[in-house]
Amino acid sequence: MPKQIDTILTNIGQLLTMESGGPRSGGSMQDLRVTEDAVIGISDGRIVFAGHQGAEEGYEARDIIDCGGRLVTPGLVDPHTHLVFGGSREKELNLKIQGMSYLDILAQGGGILSTVKDTKAASEEELIEKGLFHLGRMLSYGITTAEVKSGYGLDKDTELKQLTAAKKLGERQPVDLVTTFMGAHAIPPEYRNSPDEFLNRMLQLLPEIKEKGLAQFADIFTETGVFTVSQSRNYLKKASEAGFGLKIHADEIDPLGGAELAAELHAVSADHLVGASDEGIEKLAASGTIAVLLPGTTFYLGKHTYARAREMIDAGVRVSLATDFNPGSSPTENLQLIMSIAALHLKMTAEEIWHAVTVNAAYAIGKGEEAGQIKAGRAADIVIWEAPNYMYIPYHYGVNHVRRVIKNGKTVVSREGAALG
């Protein structure tokens, strides 16, 4: 007698399971292991089987989904966002086009301080409603797991408000969220001459954040004009002692030594890395710290020097990709677009890109054992794409290729019959 399960996805043209015993690096990022003419079984929100057609023998499902020969992959993972914020900054785009520098925009009350002001003014519920809108977009683009940072408060009340909003967002919509405390995102004007005092104030929040379960990671912006390597080391060591995983906004502009620090402290990830040194790249490879690259930020800022993804991969660094969704330097929820930018500007292959937005991205936020792979026993987080093969997604840029998103075994996005794009 056939075993009853909830759902069978059949007639899959190409299946990427992304099965891996850990984050991929070097040549293993080329090993995609495509299964053609495939099938997936789901029950109670979990994968029962995934493999070649015929694996469904002995099972009977209440729901059959015919994938029509299309591409099927794990849900995408976005390991770096700033999606809880107030306001927006569209007025700054024309100023940038006219040649106004960021410092000039900042002097006029724009830049990050504008977002800090708007985030302070917003209520917790307003931040949640705005976050729900952005997460709905992310889900529609195939993202089923994401990281979200605070950092637009720079004071106790607003940072806690952001983190609380993020926690509630995780409870009110399908995308799984991992939260990072980033109170050390910038130096407030009132602490310009006393950054150490500001960092100490942020460190004082850690016990309450931990007690309330508001964040899993702590992050700091290690960059010229923000926090030094020495300040960052002290801050992150204390965060680690308080029980937080570590992340670093490292070497976005200058080769300050953020990559080396991330490796030294065995941070889970080092993010940005546009200015990372050769030594920093070597140390990241040796430490296992994952490089989270944000090419959408470089693209949107109109810069021409991108992170050296090709050298990182060749050196053995575990590389992932993220949107860096934020209102100032990367206002997009579209990880598919980032995949195209990674191909064109980071010179990553399609195979490397798929690892970077699934399995490696999941490990970059501590979700490697739960997200980013289609594997028996794991949550059934799956995307059916309006695409014939995996190479098509980074190739055909600027549109949404999602046909259906399945989260924990349930369809949460269906664009079938719609004018896709």
From Swiss-Prot:
Residues bound to Zn(2+): 80, 82, 249, 324
Pathway in which the depicted protein is active: Amino-acid degradation; L-histidine degradation into L-glutamate; N-formimidoyl-L-glutamate from L-histidine: step 3/3
Record: residues binding Fe(3+): 80, 82, 249, 324
KW Ribosomal protein (keyword) present: no
Note on cofactor: Binds 1 zinc or iron ion per subunit.
Pfam assignment, any one: Amidohydro_3
Keywords attached to this entry: Cytoplasm, Histidine metabolism, Hydrolase, Iron, Metal-binding, Zinc
Amino acids binding 4-imidazolone-5-propanoate: 89, 152, 185, 252, 329
One of the GO BP terms on file: L-histidine catabolic process to glutamate and formamide
Enzyme class: hydrolase
Reactions this protein catalyses: 4-imidazolone-5-propanoate + H2O = N-formimidoyl-L-glutamate
Cofactor: Zn(2+); Fe(3+)
Predominant subcellular localization, coarse grouping: cytoplasm
InterPro entries: Amidohydro_3, HutI, Metal-dep_hydrolase_composite, Metal_Hydrolase
This enzyme's EC code(s): 3.5.2.7
Places the protein is found: Cytoplasm
Binding site for N-formimidoyl-L-glutamate: 152, 326, 328
The protein's role, per its UniProt record: Catalyzes the hydrolytic cleavage of the carbon-nitrogen bond in imidazolone-5-propanoate to yield N-formimidoyl-L-glutamate. It is the third step in the universal histidine degradation pathway.
Similarity-based family: Belongs to the metallo-dependent hydrolases superfamily. HutI family.
HAMAP family (UniProt xref): HutI
Protein name as it appears in the record: Imidazolonepropionase
Source organism (scientific name): Bacillus velezensis (strain DSM 23117 / BGSC 10A6 / LMG 26770 / FZB42)
